[in-house]
Amino acid sequence: MAAEAAATSRFAAACGALSQYVRAADNVHRARTAAAAAAVRPLPLMPGADVAGDEREEEGGGAAASSAAAQMTIFYGGRVLVLDECPADRAAALLRLAASSRGVPRDDLASTAAAAGESADLPVARKASLQRFMEKRKGRLAARGQPYRRHDAAAAARGDHLALAL
């Protein structure tokens, strides 16, 4: 009994020492990774981009003038329209006008109707094409014969094989 208690206490002492060693090693590892993480710094994706912005800021008074009349780009009906020197109040008025209008221009209605007419003919053309394909497929299948026919079926029909009937 005394030997078991001594073995248990030695085992507990060994486990305690091992635990302290693992904790110390973990702390050292964490300190190294923290130092390595602090040394990492992101690289700029566009190195010249920040320089161009600094030069514009140094020019000074140009920034106030450019905000009053800036360039406006409009995408409408598949077209791109670029307006130079568009004042902010006119841009806001144009946006309000675009938001309030709900109608579709007559040109778009005509092109939509023409596109619908072309797509109506498409299913008929597909159907005819499918019919031609199926007819050709039938011909190919008939030429090949049955897919699982045995080559020696003719010999079996003649009776050249041995019958094991008792």
Swiss-Prot record:
- Keywords of this entry: Jasmonic acid signaling pathway, Nucleus, Transcription, Transcription regulation, Ubl conjugation
Explain the induction of this protein.
By jasmonate, wounding, and cold, drought and salt stresses. Down-regulated by abscisic acid (ABA).
In what residue span(s) does the Tify domain sit?
Answer: 65-100
Motif Nuclear localization signal — list its residue ranges: 125-132
Chain positions of motif Jas = 123-148
Description of post-translational modifications = Ubiquitinated. Targeted for degradation by the SCF(COI1) E3 ubiquitin ligase-proteasome pathway during jasmonate signaling.
**Is Acetylation among this UniProt entry's keywords?**
no
Q: Name one GO biological process term.
A: regulation of defense response
Q: Does the keyword NAD apply?
A: no
Question: Origin, by domain of life?
Answer: Eukaryota
Q: Where in the cell is it found?
A: Nucleus
Cellular component terms per the entry's GO annotation: nucleus
Fill in the domain comment: The jas domain (123-148) is required for interaction with COI1.
Q: Which family does it belong to?
A: Belongs to the TIFY/JAZ family.
Chain's role: Repressor of jasmonate responses.
Q: What's the name of the protein?
A: Protein TIFY 11e
- Write down the species: Oryza sativa subsp. japonica
